[in-house]
Amino acid sequence: MSHSDAYDVVIVGGGHNGLVAAAYLARAGRSVLVLERLGHTGGAAVSTRPYPGVDARLSRYSYLVSLLPRRIVDDLGLRFAVRKRAVSSYTPDVRGGRPTGLLVDTGSTGRTRAAFARLTGSEREYESWRRFYGMTQRVAERVFPTLTEPLPTRDELRARIGDDAAWQALFERPLGEAIEAEFDDDLIRGVVLTDALIGTFAHAHDPSLRQNRCFLYHVIGGGTGDWDVPVGGMGALTDALADAARAAGA
């Protein structure tokens, strides 16, 4: 950072959003000052070394990467790596007095299909799962690119999605209605609904549709809905962002 009495832009807070803004503005030729109260940047996207004597950096708060557009990575020349998760989730259960559970294996449709069949006794729920997440995939492919475009109007986004059934299920009606219409098993309903409730005080049929908004940002990431693990923790990402901002002159 170059010292000056006047700046074109002052950014208060050195979290990931502030760092992205600083890097872009500095690259555009603006003089930029980032103010951060703490002794480090990154906000909630930071890493820690929790084990004495072990050089392992783990995420402290925010812990997965999904909503970061590839365009930002390429524009800023960010150097960091992510790894795919082999298992999306495992939900234990007891049925008929016997322990069981539901495995969602992102690397093996065969194992996931078998887990659904063992839990429910048929493949009906798995086919519903494929149908439901096929719908969210199509929505994600159309919605995610808008993150680096001017904000579309509601009508523009609806036209872009081009699927009235998906629009009603995800944008207009409480998400619980679509989940209950698609799935019969309560455990599977709960697994699907998890992405709608994380960090909210909403419920499946909340008329505010907060659960729908939460669900959407969990399923649109990267146009796939994948949530990847950053090598070196989330701090590796924000360190790369800080380096990019400094290199640009912020």
PLM segments and residue spans:
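Secondary-structure transition/capping motifs at alpha-helix termini
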Residues: 1-3, 26-33, 236, 242-250
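N-terminal glycine-rich phosphate/pyrophosphate-binding loop and immediately adjacent elements
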Residues: 3-142
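Conserved structured core elements
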Residues: 19, 35, 106, 169, ...
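Active-site-adjacent bridging/hinge elements
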Residues: 35-37, 210-217
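Short glycine-enriched loops at secondary-structure junctions
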Residues: 38-41, 204-210
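Rossmann-like flavin
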Residues: 97-207
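Helical element adjacent to the flavin cofactor pocket in flavoenzyme catalytic cores
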Residues: 217-250
